Every structure is written in C-alpha cells, then in structure tokens.
UniProtKB/Swiss-Prot annotation:
UniProt-listed Enzyme Commission number(s): 2.3.1.-
Protein name, as recorded: Uncharacterized N-acetyltransferase ABC2369
NCBIfam families: PRK13688.1
SUPFAM superfamilies: Acyl-CoA N-acyltransferases (Nat)
Keyword terms, alphabetized: Acyltransferase, Transferase
An annotated Gene Ontology molecular function: acyltransferase activity, transferring groups other than amino-acyl groups
Short name of one Pfam family: Acetyltransf_1
Keyword RNA-binding: no
Origin species: Shouchella clausii (strain KSM-K16) (Alkalihalobacillus clausii)
CDD domains: NAT_SF
InterPro entries linked to this entry: Acyl_CoA_acyltransferase, GNAT_dom, YlbP
Ranges where the N-acetyltransferase domain occurs: 8-159
C-alpha cells in the first residue's frame, strides 16, 4: 500500500478533522488553535500535512521553513525545516504513517529539526535523527532532535561568530 502525504487545506473541514486528534491524542500536540488562526488570517500557504486512510485523517504534522538567517542549529547556517506536532491516531500507529510524514519532510533535502516529547527519542533515532547538544539560551527547555543531510553538521559556534571569521 502506498502512503500519500498531502498538504492539508486551511478550512473548517480540516479543523473538524483535527478535533479527532484532540479527543484521542496528547493535548500538547493539538493543532486546532494553529489552524483556527490560519483560517482567520486567510493564510493559504498551509503548513499542515496529513495522511488519510480512506476519507479519515489518521496522521498529521506541521512543517515550517525557517530562514537561514535565524539558523542556530546547523553548520553551515542555512534554511531548514522545523517539524512540529507529528501525531498518528492510536488505532493507526505501527503502520508506517509517522515514518511517511518524516520521510516527506526529509525529501526537501533541507536539515530538519524537531522537539522530541518524552519517550519519543527512540522513534526519532530510528528515523535518522539525533539529539543535538543542549543550549539553554537557544533550546529553552525543549529537547531538539535533528536530521542532517549530507554535508551538514551541528553548529558549534554562533552564526554571527562564524560569519565574522
């Protein structure tokens, strides 16, 4: 079976589908407010992606492109993707939907950063992500995990220092 990742529309139908994740998933992964704000702002460039099983949305994530001028994770500093709130509904876990969403993010060829929730580190490790050296000022209590495409590594100096040299 081929798993297809789709950009989700910013509309009330998607908002209704997100309610299922709120009912069955972790509260901190709720994207309902994010989507509501996008509807209000008429933001047609949706950062939301998902996978349908039949007509039911069973997996979803947010994917944001971060400008390289704000990169504090990767060397050389560059644009990267920030993957947020990946979630697969409980009855659909273990079928490759989470992996398909992550592979979709990797397919852009940019570094990817996410924040691992408690007990999800093993999932991210299996998908080629690694924990990055914690920086209190940068990470503010988050647990960043990153995926490095070829030729990219962890940033060891601040971009301002690297550019000044």
């Amino acid at each position: 079976m081929t798993i297809k990742v789709e950009r989700l529309l910013v509309n009330y139908k998607t908002l209704e589908e997100f309610r299922h994740f709120r009912e069955y998933g972790a509260a901190e992964l709720s994207m309902k407010d994010d989507l509501k704000n996008s509807i209000i702002e008429n933001d047609s460039e949706s950062p939301f992606y998902g996978i349908y099983y039949g007509k039911k949305l069973v997996a979803r994530m947010s994917l944001y492109k971060i400008d390289g001028n704000f990169d504090r994770y990767f060397d050389p500093p560059q644009d990267y993707l920030e993957l947020w709130k990946l979630e697969v509904l409980e009855p659909y876990r273990g079928r490759g939907y989470g992996r398909a969403l992550v592979d979709f993010a990797k397919s852009f060829g940019l570094p990817v950063k996410t924040n691992a929730r408690q007990s999800t580190g093993e999932f991210w490790n299996k998908l080629g992500f690694e924990p990055i050296t914690y920086n209190e000022a940068r990470d503010r209590g988050e647990s960043p995990y990153v995926w490095f495409p070829q030729g990219v590594q962890e940033q060891t100096t601040k971009p301002e220092q690297a550019r000044a040299e």
